[in-house]
């Protein structure tokens, strides 16, 4: 199952994680982030009732299968400018102040029970080693060394809490899939990270980072499936989207389409997703706005 939004302890919008035979067309263009066109709901002068009903039906089907629609948004009221560029995310009434004015490192924890005990909302960042977690955090807060970046996979092996605007946390989780560690270390990572997901009541959402410069990786899909089955809300964040040309294999836009196709075949409702680049800043403001509406909905 996949939980798209979390409202304190209330679980909503649950969707069975089962294959589905019906395929939906993905309306996207990597080079033009304003890629989603909402079907227009307009009446015909000849037969207004029939045309309007058909248009509403088409729009509803499209929206439910492709877009992430937050609470407070009616499908019939959707317009193009409500969809964040480079994403499938609709902005609703819970979106608010999103800019980061101050950030401070709070602590590193080796176990979930050692994490901060206050009730501030948390948005966790997770991904394969060297997917760009630390770079994304530094991009979001616009400071170069808030999160330690390294070319050595598996550098971050603790749960790191950063307090933002004295009101919410960014949580930098250890990367998964690194090869140059012992099997015991991998087991420990799995145990304490999963413990964090399952027992952290203040967790609003997980940003699951996907490297757009490589084809879909089984370990990313396994992680997404595990999060879905355990009702952990997630947003797919495609990283390294500035690398428009492929040096080896397929282009990033082709890799993204391939990943989305697999997700559509396994999730009845597509989770929210967004394109980003820590180099160019692509998607930064849009992702922060999305994060704000998730936090505000959780905190109401």
From Swiss-Prot:
Keyword Disulfide bond recorded: no
Keyword match Magnesium:
yes
SUPFAM superfamilies for this protein: P-loop containing nucleoside triphosphate hydrolases
Q: Name one Pfam family in it.
A: MMR_HSR1
Q: Which GO terms describe its molecular function?
A: GTP binding; metal ion binding
Boundaries of each EngB-type G domain copy? 119-297
Chain segments annotated as transmembrane: none
Positions with a binding annotation for Mg(2+): 134, 156
Q: Keywords assigned by UniProt?
A: GTP-binding, Magnesium, Metal-binding, Nucleotide-binding
Q: Which cofactor does it need?
A: Mg(2+)
Question: Which residues of the sequence carry a binding annotation for GTP?
Answer: 127-134, 154-158, 172-175, 239-242, 276-278
Can you tell me which family this protein belongs to?
Answer: Belongs to the TRAFAC class TrmE-Era-EngA-EngB-Septin-like GTPase superfamily. EngB GTPase family.
> What name appears for this protein in its UniProt entry?
GTP-binding protein At2g22870
Write down the species. Arabidopsis thaliana (Mouse-ear cress)
What taxonomic ancestry is recorded? Eukaryota, Viridiplantae, Streptophyta, Embryophyta, Tracheophyta
The record's gene field reads EMB2001
